[in-house]
């Protein structure tokens, strides 16, 4: 009882923390997300890896003027989550020119890392991690979910010293690489509230709010690395797709107890959209055949039914049932292998009538019939097996069996009741 109360208290505390975090996120200034994508806003739509429909050159969306400077409440620094939300709210937004300049430095930094790799023979990813670790060491936001890369401090120091010992003419590449990583970090930090504003729309779909933020941050990092600043569009317009894609994929991979492959999630979502559209057109629930016809070639009623079964959410057998919560879902699931009361009663009566019918036979004759017809263990034994049991030949068992059957046929009054069970 004490353990149950403790678990309930812990669950309630976790739920209250989640609510507080979301309330804190609601108080952050809204980040301009650029043009909304209705396909990605619908939680039932599929994940699609199509290329982002980018605006034409010079069409960069300047949405920062629409943002209101909402006050950020004072918070206790003892709560790291609320502290994180508070800190990202303090980072000023970037203008289009600032985004272009930072993105240019990021690109130059990546080129410099390639040059350093050619000069030193070190792996470019390793050089990038070392430079990044140095930058993150002095970052303003040090506990950003999903952004804190881990690397052995000793290894970092050794590689850093090797880079510092480069000839003077090559050190400029190290300087450019550090500037590029600093610009990358700045571009990420300035857009973290965009992740929070998008993550708020995906709560209640199987992942906690903090998990959604972490997955969204991964999408933001990807967007920074893929951003094409020369096309002159707002970074938020570009990053929104990557953030949503990362969150949607995480929900598809992690939200269910039994994971469903992403391609199957896409199929399920397409099927759900088709079913809803048919329901609106027909004014009733569509049949499997109608859904299959609307889905197109390769679909039939059986495939529709099987796909919908895959989409079903599992339910715990320990789910409480009723207002009193004193019974569980598993208590109401019948055992399909257990015979029904009627079948059990019929079987009992049949056994009694069989015993009465066999009572006119000798003990050996009755046992031979029981073994041959599977009345003892449910398996019909061969003549050889029964002969081995009695220590006689199979021919002798055949004779005993025929004699016993003739006796039963002679006593027809005894076997008449058995025929009723066949009806």
Swiss-Prot record:
One of its GO terms (biological process) is DNA-templated transcription initiation. CDD domains: Sigma70_r4. A motif (Interaction with polymerase core subunit RpoC) lies at residues 211-214. Residues 187-257 are annotated as: Sigma-70 factor domain-2. InterPro entries: RNA_pol_sigma-70_dom, RNA_pol_sigma70, RNA_pol_sigma70_r1_2, RNA_pol_sigma70_r2, RNA_pol_sigma70_r3, RNA_pol_sigma70_r4, RNA_pol_sigma_r2, RNA_pol_sigma_r3/r4-like. Its main location: cytoplasm. It comes from the Bacteria. Residues 1-76 are annotated as: Disordered. Residues 78-113 are annotated as: Sigma-70 factor domain-1. Coiled coil: none annotated. Keywords: Cytoplasm, DNA-binding, Sigma factor, Transcription, Transcription regulation. It is found in: Cytoplasm. Sigma factors are initiation factors that promote the attachment of RNA polymerase to specific initiation sites and are then released. This sigma factor is the primary sigma factor during exponential growth. Belongs to the sigma-70 factor family. RpoD/SigA subfamily. Contains 4 domains, connected by flexible linkers. In the active conformation, the domains are in an extended conformation, each making extensive interactions with the RNA polymerase catalytic core. In the autoinhibited state, sigma-70 factor domain-1 packs closely together with sigma-70 factor domains-2 and -4, contrary to the extended conformation that is seen when the protein is part of the RNA polymerase holoenzyme. HAMAP family: Sigma70_RpoD_SigA (MF_00963). NCBIfam families: RpoD_Cterm, sigma70-ECF. This is RNA polymerase sigma factor SigA. It comes from Thermus thermophilus (strain ATCC BAA-163 / DSM 7039 / HB27). The gene is sigA.
């Amino acid at each position: 009882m004490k353990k149950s109360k403790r678990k309930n208290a812990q669950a309630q505390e976790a739920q209250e923390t989640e609510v507080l975090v979301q309330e804190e996120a609601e108080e952050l200034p809204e980040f301009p997300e650029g043009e909304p994508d209705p396909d990605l806003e619908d939680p039932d739509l599929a994940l699609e890896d199509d290329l982002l429909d980018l605006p034409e050159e010079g069409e960069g969306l300047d949405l920062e003027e629409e943002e209101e400077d909402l006050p950020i409440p004072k918070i206790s620094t003892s709560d790291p989550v609320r502290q994180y939300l508070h800190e990202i709210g303090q980072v000023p937004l970037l203008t289009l020119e600032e985004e272009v300049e930072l993105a240019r430095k990021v690109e130059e930094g990546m080129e410099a890392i390639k040059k350093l790799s050619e000069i030193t023979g070190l792996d470019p990813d390793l050089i990038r991690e070392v430079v990044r670790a140095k930058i993150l060491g002095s970052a303003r936001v040090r506990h950003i979910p999903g952004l804190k890369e881990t690397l052995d401090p000793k290894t970092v120091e050794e590689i850093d010293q090797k880079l510092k010992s480069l000839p003077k003419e090559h050190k400029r590449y190290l300087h450019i690489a550090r500037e590029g990583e600093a610009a990358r970090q700045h571009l990420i930090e300035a857009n973290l509230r965009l992740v929070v504003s998008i993550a708020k729309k995906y709560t209640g779909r199987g992942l906690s709010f903090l998990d959604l933020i972490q997955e969204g941050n991964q999408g933001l990092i990807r967007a920074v690395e893929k951003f094409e600043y020369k096309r002159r569009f707002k970074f938020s317009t570009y990053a929104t797709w990557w953030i949503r894609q990362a969150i949607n994929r995480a929900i598809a991979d992690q939200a269910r107890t039994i994971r469903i492959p992403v391609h199957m999630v896409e199929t399920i979502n397409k099927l759900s959209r088709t079913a809803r559209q048919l329901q609106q057109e027909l004014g009733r629930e569509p049949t499997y055949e109608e859904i299959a016809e609307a889905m197109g070639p390769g679909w039939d009623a059986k495939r529709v039914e099987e796909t919908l079964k895959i989409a079903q959410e599992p339910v715990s057998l320990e789910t409480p049932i009723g207002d009193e919560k004193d019974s569980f879902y598993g208590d109401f699931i019948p055992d399909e292998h257990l015979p029904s009361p009627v079948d059990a009663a019929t079987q009992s009566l049949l056994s009694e009538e069989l015993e009465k019918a066999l009572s006119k036979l000798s003990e050996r004759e009755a046992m031979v019939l029981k073994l041959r017809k599977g009345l003892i263990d449910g398996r019909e034994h061969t003549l050889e097996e029964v002969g081995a049991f009695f220590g006689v030949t199979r021919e002798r068992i055949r004779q005993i069996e025929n004699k016993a059957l003739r006796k039963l046929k002679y006593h027809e009054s005894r076997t008449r009741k058995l025929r009723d069970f066949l009806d």
